[in-house]
């Protein structure tokens, strides 16, 4: 319990530092705009390119479309919520696939030697080229009455980016137990499944938690980029493109969508932080290092 409280306390301190960093960025933003009026800078600091911080926040209350009852804030909140569902769906699929691959590669050495190079090579494919390919293939797929949609393509791309760090981290964690512990389990006639669940998985937690964080971040990035690439509507990625078209008349509006994407990432990070506390609450401090 004390270990959990200590981790929560450290998390609170980290949050305060993060808030201080946000305030510092806002101050530097405004100082840069002021400096741009005094001397010539190598980039544009006009209100068209760099709106004031208060202009960005006032854009939250603007109607999304002239005459509409829906505010920009409501539209961004709905889009971020939709993207969150897609990102978490892709993240879950990526975690399951990554864990299965890690277990198979740990259990069978020839699979590790054969699969690992392909797992690594899979991440060298440019996402911008992969998205249209997945959409094109997906349009030919149907499961009875269920037709593949671009929503599934977005989740697939998110899972594609999420599975790699999880599979590598899980594989390293499953291989972490020292030979003495493995020999002790085998001396008790423990089966491979017993060793997996009672020794390898607990030993892999310090490796799994960082891998989960990277996978979650990759799933969010994959979701936003896939929404832009595939043109799926309703998500924060597509909303940023739509608001970017209005930069001439409302330059601050696009930043509201960017704030929505940032908030999406922070929510996912908070979810993973809660999972982190849950998984590591009983680990000794040495295991958390």
Task: Enumerate the predicted regions with their spans.
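Periplasmic/extracellular loop-to-transmembrane helix junction in inner-membrane transport proteins
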Residues: 37-92
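Generic hydrophobic transmembrane alpha-helix motif, especially the helices
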Residues: 120-165, 172-173
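Hydrophobic alpha-helical transmembrane segments of polytopic membrane proteins
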Residues: 236-276
